[in-house]
Amino acid sequence: MTLGASLNIDPKVLAGVLNTSSARCWSSDTYNPYPGVMENVPSARGYTGGFSADLMLKDLGLAVDSARLSKHPVLMGALAQQLYQLMSSKGEGQKDFSAIIKLYQTFL
Protein backbone atom coordinates (compact mmCIF):
# COMPACT_ATOMS: atom_id res chain seq x y z
CA MET A 1 0.00 0.00 0.00
CA THR A 2 2.80 2.40 0.86
CA LEU A 3 4.60 1.61 -2.39
CA GLY A 4 1.40 2.22 -4.33
CA ALA A 5 0.83 5.53 -2.57
CA SER A 6 4.39 6.61 -3.40
CA LEU A 7 3.57 5.89 -7.06
CA ASN A 8 0.41 8.03 -6.79
CA ILE A 9 -1.92 5.03 -7.02
CA ASP A 10 -5.17 5.64 -5.17
CA PRO A 11 -5.13 3.34 -2.10
CA LYS A 12 -8.74 2.23 -2.63
CA VAL A 13 -8.00 1.34 -6.26
CA LEU A 14 -4.85 -0.56 -5.27
CA ALA A 15 -6.71 -2.46 -2.55
CA GLY A 16 -9.36 -3.40 -5.12
CA VAL A 17 -6.70 -4.74 -7.50
CA LEU A 18 -4.93 -6.65 -4.74
CA ASN A 19 -8.16 -8.14 -3.46
CA THR A 20 -9.11 -9.54 -6.88
CA SER A 21 -5.73 -11.19 -7.46
CA SER A 22 -3.44 -13.71 -5.84
CA ALA A 23 -2.26 -10.91 -3.52
CA ARG A 24 -5.57 -11.04 -1.65
CA CYS A 25 -5.11 -11.65 2.06
CA TRP A 26 -6.78 -10.91 5.38
CA SER A 27 -4.79 -7.74 5.96
CA SER A 28 -5.84 -6.26 2.62
CA ASP A 29 -9.48 -7.34 2.33
CA THR A 30 -10.64 -7.45 5.95
CA TYR A 31 -8.35 -5.32 8.13
CA ASN A 32 -6.56 -2.94 5.77
CA PRO A 33 -3.99 -0.89 7.72
CA TYR A 34 -3.94 1.99 5.24
CA PRO A 35 -6.17 4.91 6.31
CA GLY A 36 -9.10 5.72 4.05
CA VAL A 37 -9.35 2.33 2.37
CA MET A 38 -11.95 0.69 4.62
CA GLU A 39 -14.54 1.75 7.15
CA ASN A 40 -14.99 0.13 10.56
CA VAL A 41 -11.35 -0.88 10.98
CA PRO A 42 -8.79 0.69 13.32
CA SER A 43 -7.02 2.55 10.48
CA ALA A 44 -10.28 4.45 9.92
CA ARG A 45 -10.34 5.49 13.60
CA GLY A 46 -6.79 6.67 14.13
CA TYR A 47 -5.78 3.10 15.01
CA THR A 48 -7.93 3.04 18.14
CA GLY A 49 -9.65 -0.14 19.22
CA GLY A 50 -8.62 -3.54 17.99
CA PHE A 51 -5.69 -5.63 19.22
CA SER A 52 -3.03 -3.42 20.79
CA ALA A 53 0.55 -3.34 19.58
CA ASP A 54 1.69 -4.04 23.15
CA LEU A 55 -0.31 -7.29 23.18
CA MET A 56 1.14 -8.19 19.78
CA LEU A 57 4.61 -7.54 21.23
CA LYS A 58 3.85 -9.84 24.17
CA ASP A 59 2.61 -12.61 21.88
CA LEU A 60 5.58 -12.25 19.54
CA GLY A 61 7.88 -12.48 22.55
CA LEU A 62 6.25 -15.74 23.63
CA ALA A 63 6.52 -17.16 20.11
CA VAL A 64 10.14 -16.09 19.62
CA ASP A 65 11.12 -17.44 23.06
CA SER A 66 9.42 -20.78 22.32
CA ALA A 67 11.20 -21.01 18.98
CA ARG A 68 14.53 -20.20 20.60
CA LEU A 69 14.03 -22.91 23.23
CA SER A 70 13.27 -25.46 20.54
CA LYS A 71 16.19 -24.22 18.42
CA HIS A 72 13.99 -23.18 15.49
CA PRO A 73 14.91 -19.95 13.72
CA VAL A 74 12.10 -17.47 13.30
CA LEU A 75 13.91 -14.65 11.56
CA MET A 76 10.86 -12.67 10.50
CA GLY A 77 9.21 -13.21 13.88
CA ALA A 78 12.25 -11.79 15.65
CA LEU A 79 12.28 -8.81 13.27
CA ALA A 80 8.57 -8.21 13.85
CA GLN A 81 9.20 -8.36 17.60
CA GLN A 82 11.88 -5.68 17.28
CA LEU A 83 9.62 -3.45 15.20
CA TYR A 84 6.77 -3.73 17.71
CA GLN A 85 9.27 -3.07 20.52
CA LEU A 86 10.31 0.13 18.75
CA MET A 87 6.67 1.11 18.27
CA SER A 88 5.98 0.51 21.96
CA SER A 89 9.06 2.46 23.06
CA LYS A 90 7.76 5.44 21.07
CA GLY A 91 4.58 5.41 23.18
CA GLU A 92 2.39 3.89 20.46
CA GLY A 93 1.80 0.50 22.09
CA GLN A 94 -1.82 1.21 22.98
CA LYS A 95 -2.72 1.66 19.30
CA ASP A 96 -3.96 -1.21 17.16
CA PHE A 97 -1.20 -3.48 15.88
CA SER A 98 -1.95 -2.40 12.29
CA ALA A 99 -0.51 1.03 13.15
CA ILE A 100 2.88 -0.60 12.54
CA ILE A 101 2.45 0.70 8.98
CA LYS A 102 3.05 4.22 10.34
CA LEU A 103 6.39 3.11 11.80
CA TYR A 104 7.29 1.45 8.50
CA GLN A 105 6.55 4.70 6.67
CA THR A 106 9.13 6.53 8.80
CA PHE A 107 11.84 4.33 7.27
CA LEU A 108 11.07 5.54 3.74
What residues fall within each predicted segment?
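Helical "substrate-binding/catalytic lid" subdomain
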Residues: 1-108
